[in-house]
Amino acid sequence: MHHQKQQQQQKQQGEAPCRHLQWRLSGVVLCVLVVASLVSTAASSPLDPHHLAKRSFFDIQCKGVYDKSIFARLDRICEDCYNLFREPQLHSLCRKDCFTSDYFKGCIDVLLLQDDMDKIQSWIKQIHGAEPGV
């Protein structure tokens, strides 16, 4: 009987470090998953600075002259609109058809940029390649 108790105690003492190690590994795995999730979320953000590449210019059907600074200014309007409403699709809908969509017009209105319309229209004309109709 005494021998069985000793074996049980030894077994329990051996399991304690294993359980502790399992908890630590579980914590490490959880941390890695959380960090990976945050990184993937940040990478898929519509406000990713790499989305201003020339490829993006063509992706939204711009057929005019690519000017990175003008493109960035127009895109900033869509970013501000997205930040205001936090609707996941708003940023891409605002940029649709080279900044000539009704969503872009709506963003101009809610951001109170009507006074800048002449300047904005000239920017759109340059990168769109035609009269914007905004």
UniProtKB/Swiss-Prot annotation:
Gene Ontology molecular-function annotations: neuropeptide hormone activity
GO CC aspect terms: extracellular region
GO biological process, one term: circadian rhythm
Keywords from the named record: Cleavage on pair of basic residues, Disulfide bond, Hormone, Secreted, Signal
Location relative to the cell: Secreted
UniProt xrefs under Pfam families: Crust_neurohorm (PF01147)
InterPro entries referenced in this protein's UniProt entry, alphabetically: Crust_neurhormone_CS, Crust_neurohorm, Crust_neurohorm_sf, Hyperglycemic, Hyperglycemic1
Cystines in this chain: 62-98, 78-94, 81-107
Family to which this protein belongs: Belongs to the arthropod CHH/MIH/GIH/VIH hormone family.
UniProt-recorded name of the protein: Ion transport peptide-like
Source organism per UniProt: Schistocerca gregaria
Lineage: Eukaryota, Metazoa, Ecdysozoa, Arthropoda, Hexapoda
